[in-house]
Amino acid sequence: MSKTAIIFPGQGAQKVGMAQDLFNNNDQATEILTSAAKTLDFDILETMFTDEEGKLGETENTQPALLTHSSALLAALKNLNPDFTMGHSLGEYSSLVAADVLSFEDAVKIVRKRGQLMAQAFPTGVGSMAAVLGLDFDKVDEICKSLSSDDKIIEPANINCPGQIVVSGHKALIDELVEKGKSLGAKRVMPLAVSGPFHSSLMKVIEEDFSSYINQFEWRDAKFPVVQNVNAQGETDKEVIKSNMVKQLYSPVQFINSTEWLIDQGVDHFIEIGPGKVLSGLIKKINRDVKLTSIQTLEDVKGWNEND
């Protein structure tokens, strides 16, 4: 029996003009976009559509923008009937909306706060991330341990696919790894355009503030399992999910294990909902046999709704 998982991208997928094609062209998507504009304390639609002030790349804006785009696409799709859902990092919040763990309005407030706390904890230039290509997890972990000291750390942060491990930590060590990468055996090390050391233990400084903030919202048991980044398991219990979303701040994203867990459950079709095809590209490198569908635009939505 064929099973389907809907999956959602995280930071890095944003681009100017995102979701503009949906606005006023699809009632369900427009409702989500309008709701985001009413709920948030900044002009999210201007930031997404034109970004005249150049603020889309700031994490406190990127996070609600991506959640809003994925949720608008999701609302516009008919006859999805997924068996599971999974998101990469920030994308996990879109999964929570999809599985009705959080309302969209609550989720968009939470990711706005998540971004603000991250930005406040690490002013630009303190922490960073980089993608290490061509090495396995054990080797990357070993390199990180050899570079880290008592006052500066670098750690594996996203275990994306074979030969692609993202590391996170103090910018000085990230820069050192970028410089030394090839001599350490990597094909290359690419710095990422992010403003903080996400998914590293450095993020524990915001754990308490974030945990107390998300406790004020209503969390519900998931309508279908959410495969969580921190443990690569499908969860439906609201308390387990909420606890894992706090741990997610400072824990590695277990994307390879999560994808393999889904395939073990019988999933043979992954539908990526949101800008870009980053996750589809990663999954191809994990398993070439699964079916991949990308829903990024109004045209993609129409194609799905007409054919399914």
UniProtKB/Swiss-Prot annotation:
Keywords: Acyltransferase, Fatty acid biosynthesis, Fatty acid metabolism, Lipid biosynthesis, Lipid metabolism, Transferase
The name this protein goes by in its record: Malonyl CoA-acyl carrier protein transacylase
SUPFAM superfamilies: FabD/lysophospholipase-like (SSF52151), Probable ACP-binding domain of malonyl-CoA ACP transacylase (SSF55048)
Active-site residue numbers: S89, H199
Enzyme class, broadest EC rank: transferase
Cellular compartments per GO CC: cytosol
GO terms (BP aspect): fatty acid biosynthetic process
GO molecular function term, any single one: [acyl-carrier-protein] S-malonyltransferase activity
Gene: fabD
Top-level taxon of origin: Bacteria
Pfam families according to UniProt: Acyl_transf_1 (PF00698)
Pathway assigned to this chain's UniProt record: Lipid metabolism; fatty acid biosynthesis
Catalytic activity as recorded in UniProt: holo-[ACP] + malonyl-CoA = malonyl-[ACP] + CoA
Catalytic activity, EC: 2.3.1.39
Family of the protein in this entry: Belongs to the FabD family.
